């Protein structure tokens, strides 16, 4: 007789840049959470759905927890903390190569107040010596009674099958919330805007990245050629940032568009014509109505 089907929700939390999105994308096998080496890349809860014949795990990739500097930062931390209460299991991801930091201490204090089981995932184990890993495990074991401590490499996939096995063991009997072939509950527009924002994050520097929102103005399909025309606007806070994103003779914007188009075509499996505009909206991160316009709705979180 076959085992009953299990399902549950798992939150992935940790300081910015510890590899949370890399882990989610490795498990799901398709890029759905944007990755960059700049902190605070993930803004909205991105849900990845991992389904096998035995179970379904719905992953929530929260923003990196940090002390907020503005309304958007405050909003991002609020999402992460609220998530702790809503899920069946928490993955607390740390970066083995940087060791214990004050940001980790901040998160552990929050985790001690929740009833949800917590797995400590020590990521980037390929970057440290085994004896340093053992010391790190002991250090964290003294700080909190974790349900499991699992060393992994999200980038290379080391020990990820074991992590999924342990996760399944912690799930309750439950329904299949999403169809078997669905990997995220975000609409295509959201993922397209995130893929464009990823290229802005990777290609620009300094103050520009965190001052960027991307709005998809329209998507049209040509019925004859099946080609998609996507119109997008990149929102920045200052005209100097607009200049950086457009670049000399429009070269930077061209690069952003070209790289984003390839990612979007890979995601959608069809040819895309991508048109991008850049618009200045002063201090949008501190204005509640702009946050809502650009997809950050407090009510949903």
Curated annotation (Swiss-Prot):
Query: Where in or outside the cell?
Result: Cytoplasm; Cell membrane
Positions of the region G3? Answer: 61-64
Q: Which GO terms describe its molecular function?
A: GTP binding; GTPase activity; ribosomal small subunit binding; rRNA binding; small ribosomal subunit rRNA binding
Q: Which InterPro entries match?
A: G_ERA_dom, GTP-bd, GTPase_Era-like, KH_dom-like_a/b, KH_dom_type_2, KH_sf_prok-type, P-loop_NTPase, Small_GTP-bd
Is the Nucleotide-binding keyword given for this protein? yes
What Gene3D superfamilies does the annotation carry? 3.30.300.20, P-loop containing nucleotide triphosphate hydrolases (3.40.50.300)
Q: Which domain of life is it from?
A: Bacteria
Which positions in this protein are listed as binding GTP? 14-21, 61-65, 123-126
Region G4: list its residue ranges: 123-126
Q: What does the entry give for GO biological process?
A: ribosomal small subunit assembly
- Looking at the UniProt entry, the stretches that span the membrane are none
Positions of the Era-type G domain: 6-173
Q: Name the membrane topology term.
A: Peripheral membrane protein
Q: What is known about its subunit structure?
A: Monomer.
Q: What is this protein called?
A: GTPase Era
Encoding gene per record: era
